[in-house]
Structures are given as structure tokens and as C-alpha cells.
Regions:
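Charged, often Cys/His-bearing segments associated with DNA-binding zinc-finger transcription factors
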Residues: 1-56, 530-533
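An anionic, glycine-rich sequence signature occurring as long contiguous blocks
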Residues: 4, 12, 296-420, 536-541
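Basic, short loop/linker segments at the boundary and entry of helix-turn-helix/winged-helix-like folds
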Residues: 40-88
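Short, solvent-exposed helix-loop connector elements
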Residues: 68-76, 407-417, 431-448, 467-468
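Short, conserved catalytic/metal-binding motifs centered on acidic residues
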Residues: 87-88, 102-103, 145, 149, ...
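Active-site-proximal, Lys/Arg-enriched surface segment
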Residues: 141, 146-230
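Electropositive, glycine- and tryptophan-enriched low-complexity nucleic-acid-binding patches
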Residues: 209-268, 382-398, 402
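Basic, amphipathic alpha-helical segments enriched in Lys/Arg and hydrophobic/aromatic residues
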Residues: 434-495
Length: 541
């Protein structure tokens, strides 16, 4: 929904105060007009990024669950554990990569710290004075040290974290964020680390490199780290399920777990009806299991499979095929040098392929060499023309599907959405959401960080997209542009803290309240008398 600057300010100040400050513009304005001392005056630009998001989480019960979060093996707490979670949430939300950068970029921000429960005194002196007498050099600003935050957040119970965010995704489903029929896209991405991370996996891969003369060379490269498996909703690009495995583990081991987790989140409010994935992500037994669950799938076939050769032969023969064609205009270049091209796409669909022996239960697969073996039938879509390239009657790329192929273009076009995963989630999470920098170099830290980051990304995405559509009616914009839009709306606002209260004012209003005469006043900002009347204050001469 579209908000005024006053409403945005109200949301930022009121909804993020962790039982520390209370919104009272009139009380704070009175102190300003009387020239009384206040605790601090800060810009509100960073707080604008938070906006209604965390208020909505509070409404659906997520904040209450976070308040009950506990770390494992925590003997005592000088700071409520929820404040550690909120601090780490701010780090994740603002994309701060390194823990050591927190004092300069976050902990020293006196405008944000009161919003998560720390007062200005905590920012300057910390919550604990232990060791202050023996400290050499200046104290690092902030309520706690980055090492303490990392130590506490890693002790977060992974099962509790799963329950918190899984319940939140179900709440979004209940609110109608998803359509009744949801299409899922499954893919995996590497989270590379060094060998110094305890518990990391390792895998050796062959990489082909070319020298300056164009000669190719193959070298073996060992990669350390983990593998993040995702199942996204195709329309919202919201992660429905997340699994973390070691880098050497195959994606197929996690396919059923992803689908089961996503179906659990949507149960009662929506249905996972289709799944698209890359080659090798799902083996034949998993594809058969999806078929028995009533879930349609589209997956590219490997070139060395017998069913791929059978599909090429059927396409070349041209018998019992359904043909789909599409021609669209593609624009190239910019300005005067721009030119357009008509690009044709042609695909053919076929049914009843019988050479996919692994398409069935594990018991069915073991009988593949028996004389009385009967393979389960599967459909296919073969691409003959794509992006202006003619692959001949037999085609090149083959997609296996259990969906109807009377119209072969829809399965082919739907598979194109799979390529959006790297741009809409994996790259977004790795770059602005900082997926690749866990707080510690341990397996537990990596798992907590990945789950925390992707679940927060999922919740924020589910909140952002409906707001954009309602406010602008345009296509959704990326996270970075959306952040810039929020910053633009609140760049001229300041937040004033006075004892246990805070107030949000336009910079021009603040200037007039403290007695500064301004020749240039923005539209909508009257004289000092008008500002005093707005806050129901008597004029003081």
C-alpha cells in the first residue's frame, strides 16, 4: 500500500521499538520548542528500509516467536536473545558482509540501535563494563562486540529457526500471497569456502581453460564448502524450501525433501502443482514419485540417455507429433544503431516414450533387464528452432515431462523460468543479502546463516511484491531499487529521542521548532506558528 511520509515515519519509529522508546511527536516537539535537552537527533534514512515489514511480521506472530528464541548451551544472558536476533537481522537486511565491519556500519548508528532495544548509552559504553579498566586504546563503538554477536547467533537452535520461519511462510500462504496452484523451480548453488571451515565438504572438478592462443587445457580444481538447495515459487520468486548439504553431495539426494517441505508450507492454502528443475537434479525414481503425487514436472534430458535418442528419432520421423510455433521480435542495440530481428521458435511434442527404464519405483528399476519388463511411458518436447538457430527435424534439446503435450510450447516456455533462479534468488541472496559470509567458520554457523538469510529473504520478498503492485501497478523491481525508493521517501526526515520517547519530524519542521528561521521552506511546511499548531502547542515568544 502507498504511505505518506508521516505514516512511514510512524511505522519505522513505532513498530521497531523493542519496549524502549514510545512514539509521541507532541511531547518531543514541546521539548524542542522549549529549547530543552534531548538525547539525540538522527537521520531516518536507514530506518526507512525497514518500513512496514517488521510490523507485519509482528501482526502474523513472527516477532512473538522470535521473542521466545533461545540459544543452545546459553548459561546466562546479559542481553535478551531476541535482541541478538534483531541485530543479526539488521546485518542481513543491510547486506553487511563482515562481522568486523559492524561497529563502523551498524553498531555506531545511534538512530538504529534504539529501534532494536539499545539506548545511546549502550552505543557509547556498551552493555557491560567488564575489562574497561584494563582496556588499551579506544573502545570499539556499539552495545556488544561483533565476536559476541557471532557467538550468540551461532548458538541459535536450528530447529527453532526452522519452526519460526516455516510458520511465517505458512502465514503468508494463509494471507493469500500464493495462487491456488503454485509452480516450483528447483536448483542448487555452491557456497564456496576455504578448507579452514570445519565440517565443510570438498569435491574435485575438471575445469577447462583456454590460453591466449585459444588452446584448451583441462585442470583439476578442488572446491570446498556447501551446497544450498532451493525450491522457489515461480511467480513470487520466494523460497518455499531450503536445504543445506556438503559440496560433494548430489542434488538428487535432497529433491524429495525440498518438495515435501514446500508442500507442508502450502498445505491447506495452496497446492504445489508443477516443478521445474535442471538436468540431474531429480533421478527417475523421484520423477516417478512426483508423478504419483499428482505433480507435473519438466526437466531437460541428458544427451546420453536412451530416451533422448528415442525422442530425436520420433522428431525426425515426423509421425504422431504436435507442433508449436512462435515468432517474436527481438530488439538489438541502442539509439540510431538499434535494429530488430524476427526470431522463430519451433518445438514438437510426443507421447508414450518407453526407453526411460529408471522412470519408476526402485523395485521397478531393478527389473529393467528382464524380458517381461514394461517401462512406464513419459512424454517429451523436442526443440527444433530456438533463438534463430535451426536444429533440424530431429532437434537438439529434449525436455521430459508428464504434462500433456497437445500444446508443446507451454512446457518449453515454463522451463525458461528455471534460469531466473540465479538472478532472482541465488545472486540476490549472495550479493545484497550477503549469503556467502557466515559469522564463524564452522558448519553450524554456515547452516544457521544460510537458513536465517534465505528465510528472511523469503519473508521480505512476500511482503515487498504485493506492496509494489498495489502502489505502482508496475512490474516488480529488484531489491536494490526498492531500497532506493524507500530511502528517497524518508531522506528529509529526522528522528529525535528524548528520554523514553521519540518523535519523527521533517527536517524543516525540526528547524522551525528549535527556532531556526528558514527562508526556503518545502511545500506543505508553513510558518513556525503552523508547525506549533500542528502539534497542539502554544506559541512561545
Amino acid at each position: 500500500m502507498r504511505h505518506t511520509n508521516d505514516e512511514l515515519a510512524q511505522n519505522v519509529a513505532e513498530r521497531w521499538c523493542w519496549e524502549v522508546t514510545h512514539r509521541d511527536d507532541t511531547r518531543v516537539a514541546r521539548r524542542l520548542s522549549c529549547q530543552q535537552e534531548v538525547d539525540g537527533v538522527y537521520r531516518l534514512d536507514e530506518g526507512a528500509v525497514l518500513d512496514d515489514f517488521f510490523h507485519l511480521l509482528d501482526q502474523i506472530g513472527v516477532m512473538a516467536v522470535l521473542a521466545e528464541a533461545r540459544g543452545t548451551a546459553m548459561q546466562r544472558e546479559m542481553v535478551p536473545y531476541v535482541q541478538d536476533v534483531l541485530l543479526y537481522g539488521l546485518k542481513t537486511r543491510f547486506g553487511i558482509e563482515r562481522m568486523n565491519a559492524l561497529p563502523a556500519l551498524l553498531f555506531s548508528d545511534a538512530a538504529l540501535m534504539p529501534l532494536v532495544g539499545f539506548k545511546a548509552q549502550h552505543v557509547r559504553q556498551g552493555v557491560c563494563q567488564r575489562g574497561a579498566a584494563t582496556r588499551q586504546g579506544e573502545r570499539t563503538p556499539g552495545p556488544i562486540s561483533p565476536a559476541i554477536l557471532a557467538h550468540h547467533i551461532v548458538k541459535l537452535n536450528v530447529w527453532d529457526l526452522e519452526c519460526v520461519f516455516n510458520g511465517a511462510i505458512r502465514a503468508w500462504a494463509k494471507a493469500g500471497v500464493f495462487s491456488p496452484q503454485v509452480t516450483g523451480m528447483a536448483d542448487g548453488t555452491d557456497l564456496e569456502t576455504t578448507e579452514r571451515y570445519t565440517g565443510c565438504g570438498q569435491v574435485t572438478r575438471t575445469v577447462r581453460l583456454e590460453d591466449t592462443w585459444g588452446t584448451g587445457h583441462e585442470i583439476a580444481v578442488t572446491v570446498y564448502g556447501w551446497k544450498v538447495l532451493l525450491l522457489l515459487a515461480a511467480v513470487t520468486k520466494m523460497p518455499l524450501a531450503v536445504q543445506v548439504g556438503q559440496s560433494q553431495e548430489h542434488e538428487a539426494l535432497w529433491a524429495r525433501a525440498l518438495v515435501t517441505q514446500a508442500r507442508m508450507h502450502l498445505a491447506g492454502y495452496a497446492r504445489l502443482s508443477q516443478v521445474f528443475c535442471e538436468r540431474g537434479f531429480m533421478e527417475g525414481t523421484t520423477r516417478w514419485w512426483l508423478d504419483q503425487q499428482g505433480i507435473r514436472l519438466v526437466v531437460p534430458a541428458k544427451t546420453n540417455m536412451a530416451v533422448t535418442a528415442e525422442a530425436h528419432a520420433h522428431a525426425a520421423a515426423g509421425e504422431d507429433l504436435t507442433v508449436g510455433r512462435r515468432v517474436h521480435t527481438v530488439r538489438h542495440g541502442q539509439g540510431r544503431t538499434a535494429w530488430t530481428e524476427r526470431v522463430a521458435t519451433e518445438v514438437v511434442g510426443m507421447t508414450g516414450l518407453t526407453t526411460y527404464d529408471h522412470y519408476g519405483t526402485p523395485e521397478h528399476k531393478r527389473h529393467a533387464n528382464r524380458r517381461d519388463f514394461q517401462a512406464h511411458r513419459i512424454n517429451a518436447v523436442v526443440v527444433r528452432k530456438w533463438q534463430g538457430q535451426d536444429q533440424g527435424p530431429a532437434g537438439k534439446t529434449v525436455f521430459l515431462t508428464n504434462a500433456p503435450v497437445e500444446q508443446p510450447l507451454p512446457p518449453f516456455e515454463d522451463d525458461d523460468n528455471r534460469s531466473l533462479i540465479e538472478h532472482c534468488c541465488s545472486k540476490e541472496a549472495k550479493q545484497p543479502w550477503d549469503l556467502g559470509h557466515p559469522p564463524q567458520k564452522t558448519e553450524r554457523a554456515v547452516r544457521v546463516h544460510v537458513l536465517f538469510t534465505l528465510r528472511l529473504f523469503a519473508l521480505a520478498t512476500a511482503y515487498r511484491l504485493p506492496c509494489e503492485r498495489e502502489a505502482t501497478g508496475r512490474e516488480p523491481v529488484g531489491w536494490q531499487r526498492w531500497r532506493r525508493q524507500l530511502l528517497e521517501q524518508t531522506r528529509e526526515l529526522v528522528i529525535v529521542f528524548a528520554q523514553d520517547y521519540d518523535g519523527i519530524f521533517h527536517l524543516a519542521e525540526y528547524s522551525l521548532l528549535v527556532g531556526v528561521k528558514r527562508k526556503d521552506r518545502p511545500p506543505g511546511i508553513g510558518t513556525r506558528q503552523d508547525v506549533l499548531a500542528k502539534y497542539r502547542l502554544m506559541s512561545r515568544h
